[in-house]
């Protein structure tokens, strides 16, 4: 049997990856939602507790942001400041369903191809046949 231990280990690793691959989730396809603890999401929007977001804007409780600027409640005492323009609401990015389903189909196709390769490697290891170039 001329099958190396490296190819057998690779076949086992691929088989384990296929077994555990349905439990994995692609974060890029997940929407920009806050997590269960309430931290800011990936797009920097404030969480459920009103804390400052990743871009340093003031929270709902009137605290200063990360850049040291006071919010509207505290800046009223200064008469030299210019009135701030109202900010536009941030748009949430909506990923179309056809993109999500297409990514799922591609993932399943890749997992199927890897599964076929792993099964053939395991079968070759069990039977003891390997493809050798003819001389």
Swiss-Prot record:
Region annotated Disordered, chain positions: 69-95
Compartmental location: Secreted; Target cell membrane
Keywords for the protein's UniProt record, in alphabetical order: Glycoprotein, Membrane, Neurotoxin, Secreted, Signal, Target cell membrane, Target membrane, Toxin
CC annotations in GO: extracellular region
Keyword Signal on entry: yes
Residues of the propeptide: 22-72
Main location as per UniProt: secreted
Skewed-composition ranges (Basic residues): 75-93
Signal sequence range: 1-21
Miscellaneous note of the record: Very highly expressed in the venom apparatus (5%).
Homology family: Belongs to the formicidae venom precursor-01 superfamily.
Known function: Neurotoxin that triggers pain behavior and inflammation in mammals, and is paralytic and lethal to insects. Causes a time-dependent increase in cell leak current. May act by targeting membranes.
Protein name: U-myrmeciitoxin(01)-Mg7a
């Amino acid at each position: 049997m001329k099958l190396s231990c490296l190819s057998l280990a690779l076949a086992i690793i691929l088989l384990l990856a296929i077994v555990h691959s349905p439990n994995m989730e692609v974060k890029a396809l997940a929407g920009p939602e806050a997590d269960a603890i309430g931290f800011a999401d990936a797009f920097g929007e404030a969480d459920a507790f009103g804390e400052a977001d990743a871009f340093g804007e003031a929270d709902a409780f009137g605290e200063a942001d990360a850049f040291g600027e006071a919010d509207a409640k505290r800046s009223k005492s200064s008469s030299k400041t210019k009135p701030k323009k109202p900010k536009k609401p941030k748009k949430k990015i909506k990923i179309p369903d056809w993109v999500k389903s297409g990514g799922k189909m591609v993932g399943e196709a890749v997992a199927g191809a890897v599964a076929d390769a792993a099964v053939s490697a395991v079968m070759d290891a069990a039977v003891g046949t390997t493809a050798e170039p003819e001389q």
